[in-house]
């Protein structure tokens, strides 16, 4: 029996985590939940179904309402509540299904309490990869990736000699704008950006997918997650989104993980690891998926991946700054303050101006993040 903490329970990944939990009875217990969105009704339904020991929320109105409805459950508010959810003594696996850097203190606290980390929050590794992975090694904690690309790489790399690995390949659908010309990209609408051809995701990650910043973030995440200093990490466009990641070995062999474009597959793999359980949905059918296409990323139209590689080379505070500035720029786009085609040029200008510093502590990382967001609001 695995005892789970779930951060981000009402978001897209969180809801699918609970779908997997429902489908494999007598395997999991939901000990704690945290939901920092505004979907109060969904959270109430989850509490009634799973009866967690502890629940954490951000909104004070939600906090007060839950305390009235569930007097037998410990209801907590704010960042301290999030940390408590992640580190509850009965928990054996902390699932971080939320996006954004807000979950970072809880991730670090859970690692220090030696909880297995199931991670769908790429910002934790992009902004604080050195800190998070160092703490994980020191505490003997395993970080299991939920992101479909990193989960695919994890499965391909399991049990392999790192000296035999030549290249890691992440796949990208290309996002909702992949077929638009450079001229057309100058005038895309919010509706076009949010109309992803394959994945159903939240607005922030959908915008990141459209700029391919998401793939840049994933390259940085893969570097910290797998710790393969000398191994090349690349991304390729794969419109069908059936191959999620590939590992090329020194002898020319390539291993890949293939499944339909559903997050249920990597979520189930992580939750049941190191065991495997029957899939809760239909798997990959070669006869109905006979076309697999791969294309290089057009860096002229989508320069963000090249920018992310530069960020990775500089290390230090650069990843944190890159992540924070991008998130603020995306929110400005969603609010109608800037156009889509301004996001990456503004991000590149901010990165050019940032003076890299060492980021060893949580406090330093959060300070750089705040600086990045403030500067992105002003540019």
From Swiss-Prot:
Pfam families: DXP_redisom_C (PF08436), DXP_reductoisom (PF02670), DXPR_C (PF13288). It comes from the Bacteria. Mn(2+) binds at residues 147, 149, 218. One of its GO terms (molecular function) is NADPH binding. Catalyzes the NADPH-dependent rearrangement and reduction of 1-deoxy-D-xylulose-5-phosphate (DXP) to 2-C-methyl-D-erythritol 4-phosphate (MEP). This is 1-deoxy-D-xylulose 5-phosphate reductoisomerase. 1-deoxy-D-xylulose 5-phosphate binds at residues 122, 148-149, 173, 196, 209, 214-215, 218. It is an enzyme of class 1 (oxidoreductase). NADPH binds at residues 10-13, 38-39, 121, 123, 202. Its EC number is 1.1.1.267. GO terms for biological process: isopentenyl diphosphate biosynthetic process, methylerythritol 4-phosphate pathway involved in terpenoid biosynthetic process. Transmembrane segments: none annotated. It comes from Chlamydia trachomatis serovar D (strain ATCC VR-885 / DSM 19411 / UW-3/Cx). Pathway: Isoprenoid biosynthesis; isopentenyl diphosphate biosynthesis via DXP pathway; isopentenyl diphosphate from 1-deoxy-D-xylulose 5-phosphate: step 1/6. Its cofactor is Mg(2+); Mn(2+).
């Amino acid at each position: 029996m695995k005892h789970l903490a779930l951060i981000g329970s009402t978001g897209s990944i969180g809801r699918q985590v609970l779908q997997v939990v429902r489908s494999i009875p007598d395997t999991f217990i939901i000990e704690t939940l945290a939901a920092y969105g505004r979907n109060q009704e969904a959270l109430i339904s989850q509490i009634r179904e799973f009866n967690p020991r502890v629940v954490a929320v951000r909104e004070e109105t939600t906090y007060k309402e839950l305390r009235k409805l569930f007097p037998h459950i410990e209801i907590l508010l704010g960042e301290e509540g999030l940390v408590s959810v992640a580190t509850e003594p009965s928990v054996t696996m902390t699932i971080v299904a939320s996006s954004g850097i807000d979950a970072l203190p809880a991730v670090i606290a859970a690692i220090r309490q030696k909880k297995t980390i199931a991670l769908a929050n790429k910002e934790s590794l992009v902004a604080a990869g050195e800190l998070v992975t160092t703490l994980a090694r020191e505490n003997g904690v395993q970080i299991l990736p939920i992101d479909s690309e990193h989960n695919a790489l994890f499965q391909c790399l399991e049990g392999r000699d790192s000296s035999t690995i030549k290249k890691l390949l992440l796949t990208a659908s290309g996002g909702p704008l992949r077929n638009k010309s450079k001229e057309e990209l100058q005038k895309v609408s919010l509706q076009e950006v949010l109309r992803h051809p394959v994945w159903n995701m939240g607005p922030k990650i959908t915008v990141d997918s459209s700029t391919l910043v998401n793939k840049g973030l994933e390259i940085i995440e893969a570097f910290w997650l797998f710790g393969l200093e000398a191994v090349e990490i690349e991304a390729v466009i794969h419109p069908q989104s059936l191959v999620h990641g590939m590992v090329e070995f020194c002898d020319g062999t390539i291993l890949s993980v293939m499944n339909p474009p559903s997050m249920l597959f990597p979520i189930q793999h992580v939750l049941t690891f190191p065991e495997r359980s029957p899939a809760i949905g239909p798997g990959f059918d070669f006869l109905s998926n006979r076309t697999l296409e791969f294309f290089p990323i057009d860096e002229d139209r989508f320069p963000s991946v090249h920018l992310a590689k530069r960020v990775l080379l500089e290390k230090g505070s650069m990843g944190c700054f890159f992540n924070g500035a991008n998130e603020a720029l995306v929110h400005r786009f969603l609010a109608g303050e800037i156009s889509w085609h301004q996001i990456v040029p503004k991000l590149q200008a901010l990165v050019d101006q940032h003076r890299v510093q060492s980021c060893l502590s949580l406090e330093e990382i959060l300070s750089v993040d705040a600086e990045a967001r403030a500067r992105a609001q002003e540019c």
